[in-house]
């Protein structure tokens, strides 16, 4: 069971994201439900560590098993979701991933994979393209140039 619950018109999520980089580009995705780019990842399940969750989510979405380099951020986000209109309180752990033992960089600049009933389109976005892209999380548009060496706690209000 995902660690996510709804109270009236608000929703709490505990999730993880994979920061996957190659040559000043970040791997982002979108699907038929979302007009914006976002990072691979998803909700943490009960009795699952964040590390287990990020590896599982990357496997489910990309069919590869990367290694975790290090945790980057614990982001406390407060926002209204563009798709469902709910007000979210989200805790998300962002992990820098090591993809050296995967084929992700050989899949091309844009590629598509299916997960269940959803089709995900993945795209390698140049760092300098993020500032003008419809991309979440917003803080990453600037922070991508200055990745922390230790886990950093932050808050984002929208």
Say what each PLM segment does.
Residues 65-74:
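A short coil-to-beta-strand element that immediately follows conserved catalytic motifs
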Residues 35-37, 103-158:
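Nudix hydrolase/Nudix homology domain
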Residues 8-12, 85-91, 114-119:
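A generic structural micro-feature
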Residues 79-107, 143:
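Active-site-adjacent beta-strand/loop module that shapes the phosphate/pyrophosphate-binding cleft
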Residues 1-8, 81-85, 110-112:
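Short, P/G- and charge-enriched loop/turn segments at secondary-structure junctions
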Residues 24-26, 34, 45, 74-79, ...:
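Short, charged/polar surface micro-motifs in flexible loops or helix N-caps
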Residues 1-19, 23:
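Acidic, metal-coordinating catalytic segment for phosphate/diphosphate chemistry
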Residues 22-61:
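Conserved Nudix-box catalytic region and its N-terminal flanking loop in Nudix hydrolases
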């Amino acid at each position: 069971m995902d660690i996510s619950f709804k109270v009236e018109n608000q929703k709490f999520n505990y999730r993880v994201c994979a920061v996957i980089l190659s040559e000043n580009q970040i791997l982002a995705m979108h699907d038929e439900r979302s007009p914006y780019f976002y990072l691979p990842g998803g909700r943490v399940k009960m009795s699952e560590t964040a590390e287990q969750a990020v590896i599982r989510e990357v496997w489910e979405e990309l069919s590869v098993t990367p290694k975790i380099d290090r945790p980057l951020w614990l982001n406390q986000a407060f926002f209204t979701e563009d798709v469902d209109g709910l007000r979210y309180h989200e805790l998300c752990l962002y992990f820098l991933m090591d993809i050296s033992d995967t084929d992700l960089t050989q899949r091309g600049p844009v590629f598509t994979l299916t997960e269940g009933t959803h089709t995900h389109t993945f795209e390698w976005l140049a760092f300098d393209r993020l500032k003008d892209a419809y991309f979440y999380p917003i803080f990453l548009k600037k922070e991508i140039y200055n990745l922390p060496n230790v886990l950093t706690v932050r808050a984002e209000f929208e």
